[in-house]
UniProtKB/Swiss-Prot annotation:
SUPFAM superfamilies: alpha/beta knot
EC class of the enzyme, as a word: transferase
Function: Specifically methylates the pseudouridine at position 1915 (m3Psi1915) in 23S rRNA.
Record has Kinase as a keyword: no
Assembly and interaction partners: Homodimer.
Subcellular localization, as worded in the UniProt entry: Cytoplasm
Organismal lineage: Bacteria, Pseudomonadati, Pseudomonadota, Betaproteobacteria, Burkholderiales
Gene: rlmH
Catalytic activity from the UniProt record: pseudouridine(1915) in 23S rRNA + S-adenosyl-L-methionine = N(3)-methylpseudouridine(1915) in 23S rRNA + S-adenosyl-L-homocysteine + H(+)
Tagged with keyword Iron: no
Residues annotated as binding S-adenosyl-L-methionine: L52, G83, L102, S103, S104, L105, T106, L107
Full protein name: Ribosomal RNA large subunit methyltransferase H
Length: 135
């Protein structure tokens, strides 16, 4: 199972680079529709797509861990999409298998990246029985 995070944005502060590894940089000076073309091209073939949007479905860390276990067992690769300042183009949301939100708050996309990576790590530690996550 591979997890891919596709995100748009300007050069991130150093703390973002410390928390994440940039897989592919997408230029931020494009319109929403042009961003959608670039984002769609960055999605690995056959990958299930989860769009992150402030109006998406709430998730819990435990639910994420359960979902990761299911995807791993089924052999699915997953791509998480994080939009720029204007969010994601509607075409990306309609083609996504799910739309999730990380918070009821509106988050800057740099913070959303870090939060997503931390939650993926936390969910993974739950599956491994590691004591990082505490109820």
């Amino acid at each position: 199972m591979r997890l891919t995070i596709v995100s748009v944005g300007h050069k991130m502060p150093d703390w973002v680079a410390t928390a994440t590894i940039e897989i592919k940089e997408i230029k931020p000076d494009l319109t929403l529709a042009k961003e959608a073309v670039k984002i769609a091209a960055a999605i690995p073939k056959g990958s299930r797509v989860i769009a992150l949007d402030e109006r998406g479905k709430d998730q819990t860390t435990q639910n994420l861990a359960t979902q990761l276990a299911s995807w791993r067992q089924e052999g699915f690769d997953i791509t998480f999409l994080i939009g720029g300042a204007d969010g994601l183009d509607p075409s990306l949301k309609t083609t996504a298998q799910a739309i999730w939100r990380l918070s009821s708050l509106t988050l800057p996309h740099a913070m959303a990246r870090v939060l997503l990576v931390e939650q993926l790590y936390r969910a993974w530690t739950i599956l491994q029985g590691h004591p990082y996550h505490r109820e």
